[in-house]
C-alpha cells in the first residue's frame, strides 16, 4: 500500500485521468473530491462489498434455477 501525506487543497493523480483532492478534515473524517472519467464507477467500500455479495447471491440463485430447469427438462425427455 502506498501511503501519502496531503493537506487540504492538495491533490494527487492516479494515472492521467483520475485526480483526488483533499477538501478538508473534521475530527477523524477526511473529505475528498474525486475527478474521474464519466464512464468510471466509484463506490464507497461498504457499498461495493454489498453489491459484490448481492451479485454472488444472485449467481448462486441463477445456478440453482438453471439446475432445476435442467432436471425438469431431463425428466420430461424420459417420458
UniProtKB/Swiss-Prot annotation:
It comes from the Bacteria. Homodimer; the beta-strands of each monomer intercalate to form a hydrophobic core, while the alpha-helices form wings that extend away from the core. The lineage of its organism: Bacteria, Pseudomonadati, Thermodesulfobacteriota, Desulfovibrionia, Desulfovibrionales. It is found in: Cytoplasm. Belongs to the CsrA/RsmA family. GO terms for molecular function: mRNA 5'-UTR binding. Coiled coil: none annotated. The keyword Repressor applies. Transmembrane segments: none annotated. Keywords: Bacterial flagellum biogenesis, Cytoplasm, Repressor, RNA-binding, Translation regulation. This is Translational regulator CsrA. Disulfide bonds: none annotated. A translational regulator that binds mRNA to regulate translation initiation and/or mRNA stability. Usually binds in the 5'-UTR at or near the Shine-Dalgarno sequence preventing ribosome-binding, thus repressing translation. Its main target seems to be the major flagellin gene, while its function is anatagonized by FliW. One of its GO terms (cellular component) is cytosol. One of its GO terms (biological process) is regulation of carbohydrate metabolic process. InterPro entries: CsrA, CsrA_sf.
Amino acid at each position: 500500500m502506498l501511503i501519502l501525506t496531503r493537506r487540504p487543497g492538495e491533490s494527487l493523480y492516479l494515472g492521467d485521468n483520475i485526480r483526488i483532492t483533499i477538501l478538508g478534515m473534521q475530527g477523524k473524517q477526511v473529505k475528498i473530491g474525486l475527478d474521474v472519467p464519466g464512464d468510471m464507477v466509484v463506490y464507497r467500500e461498504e457499498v461495493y462489498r454489498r453489491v459484490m455479495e448481492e451479485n454472488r447471491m444472485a449467481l448462486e440463485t441463477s445456478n440453482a434455477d438453471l439446475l432445476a430447469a435442467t432436471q425438469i427438462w431431463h425428466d420430461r425427455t424420459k417420458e
